[in-house]
């Protein structure tokens, strides 16, 4: 994370928003027609946050609310097909920020974060750091019902979706469900001329985020961030167990290292024999996220079935969503030896 002083210096140098982006796989560029609009929003936001002092939790919450508010303002102030396409679309997010031993997680929607820890008995423990924002979460249902008139109580949720359409109950964008009927009538034209396309009351209000805080311990080994597509296949406990097992077996993908300096030929032979015996546990993937994806898509009670993976990945786009959702996984490993040496700064 860029600190306040560095951000001010970069702004004074005339930086743009992409100066702070790092993409691992693809080149990231804003659509030409709306690039300048986003740059204006970024500069205004950057100037405001450098003039305000906020603790970490407040900064994360403010960032979520501000992004959603800007998406709405950009569409209403700069009316064109591009800005409205963004405003009508929806996106969820799950963000983690690590500062010394302080781990902060913020999310909106149905992506999730799970912490993997190893207890004193050598067993993997899964700790959910986020709550799903969908109809599986009773508190979410109660929250939305409380925000609506009584006459909508029996119709706001249908087929386990908001208005029978939206699966996440919190998201960026999706302003068709957030703007008032007056705004929709004045600015938006749906293909359907039916009055049912316009809601009498907004179905969603803002994009409230949920934050969590955890102080890391040496027993905390990794953090998994993933979209809902993964959690539809595997539970948090299963995910942590799979990553933990992969972490233990990944050493067999590395070159053999002798365990001591004064080893005899017999010691070396024993180590080689043990390595050979454990080769059956050798994973196919060096990357834990790739391994997790392979198990999610191809796992069976008899092991990984690669034909199942091939089938799920080769489905046509128009039917793929009926069988699997898009899956994005990030696995972050912690240096257990170093965690105990870090300062125990207070949360905030």
Question: Where would I find each of the regions flagged by the language model?
Answer:
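PP2C/PPM-type serine/threonine phosphatase catalytic core
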Residues: 1-348
């Amino acid at each position: 994370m860029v600190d306040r002083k560095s951000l001010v210096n970069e702004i004074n140098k005339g930086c743009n928003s992409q100066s702070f982006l790092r993409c691992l796989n693809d080149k990231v560029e804003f659509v030409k027609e709306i690039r300048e609009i986003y740059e204006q929003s970024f500069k205004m936001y950057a100037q405001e946050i450098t003039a305000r002092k906020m603790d970490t939790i407040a900064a994360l919450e403010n960032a979520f609310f501000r992004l959603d508010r800007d998406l709405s303002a950009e569409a209403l102030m700069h009316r064109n097909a591009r800005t409205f396409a963004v405003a009508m679309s929806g996106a969820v997010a799950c963000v983690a920020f690590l500062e010394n031993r302080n781990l902060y997680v913020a999310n909106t929607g149905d992506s999730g974060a799970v912490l993997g820890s190893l207890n004193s008995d050598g067993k993997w423990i899964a700790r959910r750091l986020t709550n799903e924002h969908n109809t599986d979460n009773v508190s979410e249902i109660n929250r939305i019902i409380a925000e609506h008139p009584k006459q909508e109580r029996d119709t706001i949720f249908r087929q386990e979706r908001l208005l029978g359409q939206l699966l996440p109950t919190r998201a960026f964008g999706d302003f068709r469900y957030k703007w008032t009927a007056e705004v929709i009538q004045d600015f938006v034209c749906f293909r359907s001329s039916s009055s049912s396309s316009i809601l009498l009351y907004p179905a969603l209000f803002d994009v409230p985020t949920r934050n969590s805080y955890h102080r890391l311990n040496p027993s905390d080994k990794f953090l998994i961030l993933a979209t809902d597509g993964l959690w539809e296949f595997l539970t948090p406990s299963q995910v942590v167990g799979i990553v933990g097992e992969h972490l233990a077996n990944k050493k067999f993908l590395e070159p053999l290292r002798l365990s001591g300096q004064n080893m005899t030929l017999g010691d070396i032979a024993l180590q080689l024999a043990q390595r050979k015996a454990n080769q059956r546990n050798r994973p196919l993937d060096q990357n834990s996220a790739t391994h997790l994806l392979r198990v999610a898509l191809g796992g069976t009670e008899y092991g990984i079935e690669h034909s199942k993976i091939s089938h799920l990945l080769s489905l046509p786009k128009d039917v793929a969503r009926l069988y699997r959702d898009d899956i994005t996984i990030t696995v972050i490993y912690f240096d257990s030896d170093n965690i105990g040496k870090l300062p125990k700064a207070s949360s905030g």
